[in-house]
Amino acid sequence: RAIFNLMAAVRRNCNEVNAMKIIKAKSYQDLSRKAANLISAQVILKPECVLGLATGSTPIGTYRQLVEWYQKDDVDFSRVTTFNLDEYVGLSPENPQSYHAFMRRNLFDHVNLAPERCHVPDGCATDLARACREYDAAIAERGGIDLQLLGIGGNGHIAFNEPGEAFEKDTHIVALKESTIRANQRFFASADQVPRQAITMGIRLIMQARKILLIAEGPAKKQALEQALFGPISAQVPAS
């Protein structure tokens, strides 16, 4: 049976391991609204919370819903801190295809998030290894991530953690698989313009979040989602 719109909310901490709630949605709009409701509830519950944010096509509707609720004074982001999962290596924040630009277009420029509280990995750092360490340190300094939003790639990747990547990694540099490059080609003029490397939070760091919200939409994600939810835990399916 195809799973067309599904949201898996996962809560993990030292006392509650592998407790998962699967929420089915009737449509993409319904999925986006339900995801936004969980995020806004986190912000209302803890106004100074730390959110982990994702890019890609799936969370766009979630961000639009959050913007709408902000404009209606239903949610206040003024004390929230955000950390994005990843960024392409070599793309400046001003590049329209960078994830810095994506977040500005879809969320940051439309709500009252303080710019100094919005963090995206620096894919143009002269010392990428140091940039990775500093990103991890910044997250730790703020007490870790309260709620992490995730999408899932067609090959089961989350963030830019590709199949085969070790789970025991924090923020690091990764070479992108050809399947990921092809999937992201639609955002660029040609496949040649898609960066071949990215800086990404690792699985270990992602799993340290107190709550994880994974959203998936469309039949193209069906196989990866089923493997992640119902298959064995494997580095070949990072989302598992």
What are these regions (language model features)?
Residues 52-56, 84, 121-122, 149-152, ...:
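Short beta-strand segments
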Residues 3-6, 10-19:
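Short, Lys/Arg-enriched N-terminal segments with co-localized hydrophobic residues
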Residues 159-203:
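Class I SAM-dependent methyltransferase SAM-binding "motif I" and its flanking Rossmann-like core
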Residues 18-51:
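N-terminal glycine-/serine-/threonine-rich phosphate-binding loop
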Residues 75-148:
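Ligand-binding beta-strand-loop-alpha-helix segment within the catalytic cores
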Residues 143-169:
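Glycine-rich phosphate-binding loop
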Residues 201-204, 208-240:
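ATP/nucleoside-binding phosphotransfer catalytic cores, i.e., glycine-rich phosphate-binding loops
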Residues 45-71:
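Glycine-rich N-terminal segment of FAD-binding domains in flavoprotein oxidoreductases
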